[in-house]
Amino acid sequence: MKRNIKLDKANSYRLSQEVLRNKALANGVNLIAPETIFLSADTTFGKNVTVEPYVVFGPKVKVGDNSYIKSFSNIEGTKIMKNVSVGPYARLREGTILKNNSKIGNFVETK
């Protein structure tokens, strides 16, 4: 029987996401509906971070303590400092730095 390489890749990706989500949860990140949140291997979280459903973290994202990421946000190459609120529907692109106590509202794109 022939192997289905595409199915193998999809299963590998699914399992790697599960490992990353479980690691975040074990470290105290509040992932609401974790199966809908996608992380990069290098995503880092501070303490008391909450992530709502349907958020995608691309490479090189750091999220500081007490931050809140709302649904349908897409974040890559961004440093989020402490007490920051993002989204919903925010698009944070490479090079974005959000300083302490910042708020990025809905349908905002940064670069």
Named regions from a protein language model:
Residues N30-K111:
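Structural signal for interior beta-strand "rungs" in well-ordered beta-sheet cores
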Residues M1-T36, A41-N48:
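Terminal amphipathic alpha-helical/low-complexity segments used for targeting or macromolecular assembly
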